[in-house]
């Protein structure tokens, strides 16, 4: 190798610019350039050793570096086999002289460097080694990626400033020399290249170098190598060397080799991006397909074709059978874009043909659509067009249906003429509407709900417990139950009880309207019940004479007396019970306890499938007195809690007294009666009296004790007040008396009306009627 002292031999060339030499078929022209500096032979060798990506032609070597200006002289190899390939027109003086090789640099400056023959031989060997590596890569395409990676590493090293290049070369140079000798023996023509720095604005036309056909053939081989390399490997190869690039362009008969700028490199080397024109137009195509599918479905339904008919007709016409599912998926946009694009022209053609044939055959025959042109077999079996009824017509039909659910043929014809509809359509609509009505309101199996239910239950036992003070009889025991509607109903119902222990029948009437005042009160413990009676207007005549009972004062109990009067006679009945109350009463409730009615209640339970403990509460529920009965288990056997409408009595009483509670009774208040609170007596009892001369439901004071009337308190209860004696009303006294000394001895009366509005409840036993 050359020592560094040989670098002193290099001097700046400023000789004539017209003298040219020819080496290996290449013409070089010397150019005067300013002196830029000299480099050592080792540095030149290191620089040339890294140019694995450079294509070389003959003995000419041209390299580019931004920070170096190098010009070297190359000598002609005497005795080399390549000298025989030199043109015979070369002057002898030029052959004996040492030719110079110019290295064209990026800055446009050229400097000459004179090298010894040994140095020139070394440079030539290195250049030939690079060409051999490139040719070997052509032959071995399987290892092209590895060569590309190695070239990328070497190119990156070549792109660095020369100051960073080591002065010593690896052992690879020796291997390259051996390969170069083999190439020289094969007389391989090397290619011609010009290196230009990427920042140079020179045009490729400035570097047109003529070469022999053998050189062109070698260049084509190199070009094929670059073409065969994968695009990804080229991209990886070009990324590490942004400062030195090479672009080859084929020309005829010459080859133009130039460098492109860094900015244009990715565009020239990488694969150009494909402009996907269909993708840009795809949204519009999708919109067009969607619109066509919607229009196709509407027009198909208008023509009266099913999806299956369309598929069969298209098979008859165009030879492509489509199933009903395919047509359905097309209309629902569930097919792929490609399949929809294929199917659209066929459907469009069929639709146009169908519409044209339909318009042509409208005047002639409605069945012309079943012609063979549209697939007669498929279209002959198509369904009848579905009838769509407008809203106003539907409302008119509903009104007609409410008037008459089963119209006659004449009625249907009249309705069809009025609505401008087909008679068959109207007939089918009424038939479907009747079926719908049956589903909504199924008919009851037990008959109509408006018909009364009457049942007679014989009772082997007596209705009322027999006591020595009561008069018995042998009258048969029957129980007649009719469904009792609420008090607001217009129906007149009754509940009649006939007992063998009673001389007469006790009838409770709930009338729609009464001409006079109707009151029912409970009498005192006085044995003369005639002084404490109230009149009840009833349509049922009396059955027998009055039956009285002895005084009940020895035993604290509650007695209830009901009277029934008519224009013919008057009957009074007194009944004694001794069933204690286990629980307090609630608001808007009537307590009825008659242990003697247990047997009849049991018979009613069996018939109505009621619970065993329903007792009279179940009877009242079955009779329709109230749907909101309390649980019968809270009361003694035979007791019932009848809850009536809160508005029957609460609307007539004073709001100050009623508050949120309601005094309820079996009978409602009279039409315009009121109960004003007149005064409080000395004992704290409330006194209700008539308001002036206006007609009133209460003809005599009604006494309430709000402090002591709670049924669970231990205080004695007294509803009889001295204020009753001071009343000057000449009408029959209507009063209620219930006395008790303890909770255990409290007896329940036949009619007990409770209103619990707070800790101290108010209780009255007055029953009114509407």
From Swiss-Prot:
Subcellular localization, as worded in the UniProt entry: Nucleus
Phosphothreonine modifications at: 271, 277
Record region (Disordered): 1-33, 68-97, 262-285, 357-385, 519-589
MF terms in GO: chromatin binding; DNA binding; DNA-binding transcription factor activity, RNA polymerase II-specific; sequence-specific DNA binding
DNA-binding region: 382-441
Tissue specificity: Ubiquitously expressed. However, isoforms 4 and 5 are only expressed in lymphocytes.
Principal cellular location given in the protein's record: nucleus
Chain positions found as Phosphoserine: 284, 388, 451
Superkingdom assignment: Eukaryota
Comp. bias (Polar residues): 1-26, 262-272
Similarity-based family: Belongs to the POU transcription factor family. Class-2 subfamily.
Name of this protein: POU domain, class 2, transcription factor 1
Organism name: Mus musculus (Mouse)
Taxonomy of the source species: Eukaryota, Metazoa, Chordata, Craniata, Vertebrata
Gene for this chain: Pou2f1
